[in-house]
Amino acid sequence: MRGCLTVLVLALLAALLGAWVGAPIVARDAVAVALRTSGFTAKSLSIRVSANPPPLLLLGHADRVHIVAGGAAVRGLQADSLDFTLSDVDLASRTFGSVDGTLVGARIAQPAGTTFSAGKVDVAGPTDAALATLQLDAADLRAMLQSAYGDAGRTAPAAVEPVPPSELAVTVAGKREVGRLAIDGGSLVMRVGDLVLRLASPGPDLPLELRTVSVGSGGVVVGGVVDVAALLP
């Protein structure tokens, strides 16, 4: 009888150890499958799933899912690198409570089939209404302005200079023009006299709404709200 009890105890310990060690691996693979079925692609991908205690993962709950990807793309968004942590994750229903992360080298699709770039995008907050902070550097702004001026049938600016708190100065055909940035209908625009230039408009496939804009000496910061749950359904 004592021998049988010993065998049972050892079997139970082995099962617990297997669940402790194996649960994160099983959960990681499940997250990878969920990402692929949502349309997410990446040239490199690392996923770490954690729960305390780890066997909770076998019940479909994860405290955190940490995703690091290079060359990432999903729907109307591409990024050179992505580093996201999802919290309070239900693996079965593929839902999560909040997100905190960063995109570097982001390219965002627009309705006309073009893209605009943001050197860095920070995302933090609840799943369906996370705050997105887009940081636009000089290269991002030049590309936006050249495209917008071209669409308006005007000569592309040769230089751009931030003028805090809300303006950009551009040099066009040797002349200096100053435009005021604003958000109009979810798009980033610049008003130069009577001319309204549309600089950035997230496309319909990307659940991102631009809401605020500010100009600093180092560039432009655009604030918005993104539905990450809709981005990674």
Short names for language-model regions:
Residues 1-59, 71-76, 231-233:
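Hydrophobic membrane-targeting and insertion signals
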Residues 40-141:
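N-terminal beta-strand/beta-hairpin edge segment
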Residues 46, 64-68, 83, 169, ...:
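Beta-strand secondary-structure signal
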Residues 52, 70-72, 87-89, 139, ...:
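Solvent-exposed coil/turn segments that connect beta secondary-structure elements
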